[in-house]
Amino acid sequence: LTAAKRTAQLAPSASPLEVLKCALLEIDTGTRCLHMTATNMEVTLRQDVPLLAYEGGDTTFAIDAKLLSAMLANLPGNTVECCKGDKDTLALSSDHAYYQVAVTSGKGFPRMNIPIPEGMVKLSGVPSMVRRAAFATDPNNSNMPLLRCVNLRLTSDGLRAVGSDGVCIVSAKGDKQCTGDQTFLIPAANLEKLAQLCEEKDTFSVGMADRQLVFVKEGFQFAARLMHGSYVDTDSLIAGTQNTFTVLSDSEELRRTLQTATAACMDNRTILHFDGNRLTLRCTGEVGSSNAALTVIPLTGQPFGDYCFAVDRLERCLRALRGTVTLGIAQTGMLTLSTEDAFYMQTQLRITAPKAKPARKKAAKAA
């Protein structure tokens, strides 16, 4: 059931190719395994499910991935009996429950090869790493495809994941034991697919082959196509950013305050007003204005002034970060947020006066 659920998550619900909505099932009598494969042409997942018993020869067929997952979820018991009929039908039964559905031969299913890289490194903590980096990318940018990507970098200090949409940048720490000297550009959407299919404790062997980044653990192989290009030099940008002042706060409290302050926000803009140990977030719209404040701890410099930032980007950042956060304003007015595991920067917006409502004309009196 777990394997079927993963397959259903990866197989696209809507696709011009009906076969991509399917899971390819291959029974291998040599290894006594059921190989379950799904692909959306960008990423491919293959899982090996051990068979308790099997009669017959090697068999290959395709079945709607979400239908398979739904049927297995509703069958009682811990084991299920599968019987492939002669006329492209599959019967699933367990205890007193029974399903019979149509399947196809699987001949039209795209054979996406998952290569085994020669040099591989160990990696764990994938979901948290993806959460801290993928939010800053721009998944719908067709003009600059690299902004749809997360830049994974193996360094001597461990793995780093960088994301940017051109307005904000985040550099997040990954597994400290995953060291090396390589860089990979992978679409954030594909990396998020992997994060949905695994747990924080899962340890993968990771390597590159045939322009794909491959993640392998027992009974599980995931391959994602890589992008090519030169990514922005984020190390230089971060190193060149000097804060004029910094304050200490809690990411969750800051997120709640932002949520409260944006009740009247109509233009995706919020003003951060710093005044010593008090930070006030203000929004003004056609329907009115709102503000919310919280107490912060000044760390360096003199926290004072008004700075305007995009609400949606700041909100996504605060949802991704955890724990204590150091919030700063750089000389250029750029906002910085730093935690133990990530460093975030966002370009400020110009503060504009709210638009005044046009005065209503008095109705002319009837003669």
Briefly describe each language-model feature range.
Residues 1-367:
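Structural preference for solvent-exposed beta-strand-turn elements
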